[in-house]
Amino acid sequence: MTPPDKKTAARKAPRKKAAPKGPGREELQFTIDSAWERRTMLTVDEIDGSTRPMVNLVMDRIESGEYRVAEPDGKGGWKVNEWLKKAVLLYFRTQDMELVEADPAPFWDKVPARFRDFDEARFRKLGVRVVPGAIARRGSHLGKDVVLMPSFVNIGAYVGEGTMVDTWATVGSCAQVGKHCHLSGGAGIGGVLEPLQATPTIIEDHCFIGARSEVVEGFVVGHHAHLQPHDG
């Protein structure tokens, strides 16, 4: 048996506090909205001191799926989180051009690759299959069991778990693709950043988008839909 004094000590031992998760949603939104209003007047010190770190934190949370540029409103529709679009646009304003190493030739861009600095452990944790030739940019969310064939997923996009992005398919900036969808070869899911209030292209769960189909910004493809390009 544990002596009484040890039991008392155990009861009184302070619990370890969880590590802080950083600024909350409201603080981030306020910072992003404020920076957006002053975007043409931001100083170097402001960008380095608060704007860029906050924008990068938002990008991290978009990548994790915690934040989405558009999300279900609980009434059968969708709502657009304009402040997240602002964050994506501010990302371009606050990042410097940099050399992106690649083979056979490097790139010169502001947006790094989603998988830059990944190793085997990080790929296994993410749970996404990435075929050679696939490109996903920083700030894109990829759910578990997503398969990326040689395709392109842009910044701010959301691709739900179990979805196949087939060869030469494109998921545009801030587009939202649901779970267990199939974007066939050459399909294009349009991207939209401006105007801010515009609804991104949305593909709901369990959809099949046929080869060479194009779904432009503002359209919502309902769940379990099957689209083929018009041949007439």
Give the location of each predicted region:
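Structural signal for interior beta-strand "rungs" in well-ordered beta-sheet cores
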Residues: 124, 128-232
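Terminal amphipathic alpha-helical/low-complexity segments used for targeting or macromolecular assembly
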Residues: 1-128
